[in-house]
A protein has these predicted regions:
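Active-site acidic/histidine proton-transfer and metal-coordination neighborhood
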Residues: 109-230, 240
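Acidic/histidine-rich catalytic cores of soluble enzymes
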Residues: 182-315, 326, 335
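N-terminal pre-domain/capping segments
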Residues: 13-143, 147, 174-177, 223-228, ...
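A short acidic (Asp/Glu
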Residues: 73-77, 108, 158-160, 203-207, ...
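Residue-identity detector for glycine
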Residues: 2-4
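Flexible, acidic glycine-rich loops studded with aromatic residues
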Residues: 304-305, 309-409
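Active-site beta-loop-alpha junctions enriched in small/polar residues
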Residues: 28-32, 66-70, 100-103, 151-155, ...
């Protein structure tokens, strides 16, 4: 759903809606399998067009494209790129953002820590990201900014020493130089967004600010940093980390950090009753990391790299502990935005809505919104819609009225 385009917020109740303030809204296609370009293109034809038909059948439809390294290289072939450009024009779709976090396989096998490889110490990560920007510059409609999101440097468990972190900064700066050159060459406004995530090199607003301060000290008074590197603010990740958007977002902006994109996403939160722990087992899969951040009533925080480890290691609370005195668990599991809350589960949608409140107060904060619920294949059956297209349409039907309530969309 793009700026000035329309979408059906709810086919039964809501009229078409138009996004305001130059906003662009899409779902991220990393929910679909597709490691080759042909597989990715097939998913656009079979799934994305089905979503478009339900949500926005008669106006331009925005796509948040996920490309693996292999798919990006295959799409860069002139014939493939021309075919895709023609397809976008024919189907009245457009790409404004690319998810460049997962480099390789992202579905159907163990991903876990592999999603962080190659990290930003690697020339492969730099070359891949540069290629994504070269493709995006050729796909963007006139007058639309382009963003690519990427991993926040590396994963803490890889134990990067200071020299390795310096390599991360150096490679990111090389990417900034390439983005700046492309922007000047093409007249496009392009920016890269680091996506903080629990247990990564950057997992909090504080760590992110410190990292940018180091970059700024290494490249003093160079405007390219602020113009071309920022943060992809994933509302699931920041909520899992117990950050409050009223603090995190203004703090990032105060330190001159661009909000490149906002991932509209939601996490699980529970109080660990015996019932809740039993129910949580259904969310412990063999594909993705589901980091768990636990905050005790005294404010102490404990982080587990994965849900199964938290369930196995965290002691049970005494049976006579009152519900209010139980710790709170927040689980990095992207659940559908429209998921109804029912005991023992809650969601972090309150964090997401607070971000939308801030966006309504200052629409210039960010123009790129991307729903990212990539966990379709590993969702417990009771949370799945009948098809992935129906689930995605339901997410639009949840988001659009909430944008409208805040003046970010209108009939």
């Amino acid at each position: 759903v793009g700026a000035g385009t329309e979408a059906k917020a709810d086919t039964q109740k809501q009229p078409f809606m138009r996004l305001n303030h130059g906003l662009h809204l899409a779902y991220c296609t990393n929910i679909h399998r597709g490691e080759t370009w042909r597989e990715t293109f097939d998913s656009l034809n079979s799934h994305t067009l089905a979503v478009r038909e339900r949500v926005c059948p008669k106006k331009p439809f925005a796509i948040g494209l996920r490309l693996s390294n292999r798919a990006a290289r295959e799409l860069s072939e002139p014939a493939a790129l021309l075919e895709f450009q023609r397809w976008l024009a024919q189907k009245d779709c457009y790409v404004f953002t690319i998810n460049g976090f997962p480099f390789g396989l992202f579905h159907g096998a163990r991903v876990k820590e592999q999603v962080y490889l190659p990290d930003w110490t690697s020339p492969e990560r730099l070359a891949y990201t540069n290629l994504l920007f070269e493709l995006l510059a050729k796909l963007l409609p006139a007058g639309v900014e382009g963003s690519v999101s990427t991993l926040p440097g590396s994963f803490k468990a890889f134990h990067l020493n200071p020299d390795a972190v310096k390599i991360v900064r150096n490679n990111l700066w090389r990417c900034i130089e390439r983005i700046a050159h492309l922007s000047e060459q093409t007249g496009r406004k392009l920016h890269l967004g680091l996506e903080p995530e629990p247990l990564c090199l950057l997992e909090s607003s504080g760590e992110t600010i410190h990292f940018f301060d180091r970059l700024r000290a290494e490249h003093p008074r160079d405007p390219r940093l602020a113009e071309h590197l920022g943060v992809n603010y994933d509302t699931c990740h920041f909520a899992v980390n117990f950050e409050e958007p009223q603090n995190a977002l203004p703090c990032l902006r105060h330190h001159g950090i661009k909000i490149s994109k906002i991932h509209v996403s939601s996490a699980l939160k529970v109080r660990p009753t015996a019932e809740a722990r039993c129910a949580l087992a259904a969310f412990a899969d063999d594909v993705y990391f589901h980091q768990v951040v636990i905050r005790r009533p005294d404010g102490q925080r404990i982080i587990y790299p994965d849900l199964d480890e938290a369930l196995a290691s965290e002691p049970y609370e005494a049976q006579d502990t009152s519900f209010e005195n139980l710790p709170e668990w927040r689980i990095h599991f992207h659940i559908p935005l429209h998921t109804p809350t029912a005991p023992p589960f809650e969601t972090t949608n309150d964090h997401l809505l607070a971000v939308l409140d801030l966006l309504a107060e200052n629409p210039a904060l960010c123009s790129h919104l991307e729903m990212e619920t990539y966990t379709w294949e590993v969702l417990p059956p009771e949370l799945k819609s009948r098809s992935v297209a129906e689930q995605l349409a339901a997410e639009y039907e949840w988001v659009l009225p909430r944008l409208a309530e805040r003046g970010l969309a209108s009939p």
